[in-house]
Amino acid sequence: KPIIEGCLQKDRKQRWTAQQVLNALQPVGWNSPPSPPPAPAAVKKPVSPIPLIASPTPFTEKISNVVTLEMVSLPAGQFLMGSPDSGPDADKYQKPQHQVKVNSFAIGKYPVTQAQYEAVMGTNPSKFQNNPQNPVEQVSWNDAQAFCRKLSQITGKTYRLPTEAEWEYACRAGTTTRYYFGDDASQLGDYAWYDGNSRYKTHPVGDKKPNAWGLYDMSGNVFEWCEDNWHDSYENAPRDGSAWLIRDNHFQILRGGSWYYNPNYCRSAYRNYYFRRDLTYDLNGFRVVCGAGRTL
């Protein structure tokens, strides 16, 4: 009744408003529900990249009182070795592309330098001797093997040349592209010394950018000897990362390109077979691996 009377007041100013009517209709003690608390501001959590493999671990080997050898330990993994059939500059020597599993091993952060070679062997056979931090060259595969044997005696560890699979695994550093930095050859000068920027000589190791695993000069500067003998293709190649060895085969694998050659030779999959194990040339050097390997 009070509601009706309030609405029928003759004086318009005294008539009840709609809000007054609503208030009168509510039960005694009723209150409108409280507004929900504002949603807390979203907290942005840092996004951690998911590594393809565990992080490589560096360590330093002492060769003499003044000369050391920097190594990088790589975890076991698997990768696609060689060039795909669709590769525009691939040749039959780099096929078929195949999956390879590799055990953990440590590899040199840089190619062996002239200072390191001389500290171990007592001589420097290199042509380009303007800087002791240049990679050693004019070393044969046999010379590289002798260095590894003597370094093993000095350190008490097993040092050797990388297998071809280990070398490509380390070079690619998780990539599947032409180069370990991508497919664009115009970027090669940031990562490698090759015919387009070398002025036809070697340069100190580590002057260019490394690959994703912190390895320098995997492309360019000097070709690097591998443990394996030469084969014309990857047909029947080992899938366990071991060296592919043949008795009485005197041609060995070289990888990585050099200061003398064009970008095609610096591709991660490129294989060079021009040299017998006893030949020396100013294009050829090596880097070492620490870890047990298979022997024939």
Residue ranges of model-derived segments:
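Short, well-ordered junction/capping motifs at the entry into regular secondary structure
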Residues: 192-219, 247-248, 273-277
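Protein kinase-like catalytic domain
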Residues: 8-11, 121, 152, 171, ...
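Disulfide-stabilized, aromatic/cysteine-rich ligand-recognition loop
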Residues: 209-211, 246-296
